[in-house]
Amino acid sequence: MRPFGEAKFLSGHQTLQLMRKKALWSKGKRVRCHTPCLPKVPRGRARRSGATTREQSPHRQGDRRRPSQGTSRPTGKTGETREGNPIGSQRIHSTCSPTDFIFLILESGGKGSLFCNEKKKRSRFDSAQPNDTSNTNDLCLECVARSLF
């Protein structure tokens, strides 16, 4: 009997994708995790100006530029960054080894998230303070597992 359930048969394309990801991890490079269940964040000039392409005003009408809601200071609310975007919609970079990463998924039993502040067993990614709720890096386990295979 296998320790983690039955083996999954992979197609040739899936095997190549997995080998590429393992190669990136072994070289110590950052791996970008795609999270399709989270909202998209504007990039480049639209993000810096704090407006989407639909909301952008005509070119400099002579009035002073006012700071938009997107450039406000952090309010201390859970799940917000300086840009006012939910933390989950930012790029997620993994610096742990693939074996540690897979072990974390298996250890959680596919329930909850990898980064949890509830009364569960704390992982090494959680903050050092026991009552700190500022660590809100919740990941959808389904998306993480999908990105591995």
From Swiss-Prot:
Protein location: Mitochondrion
Biased composition (Basic and acidic residues): 56-66
Entry keywords, A to Z: Mitochondrion
Mitochondrion as UniProt keyword: yes
GO CC terms: mitochondrion
Annotated spans, Disordered: 34-94
Protein name: Uncharacterized mitochondrial protein AtMg00660
Biological source species: Arabidopsis thaliana (Mouse-ear cress)
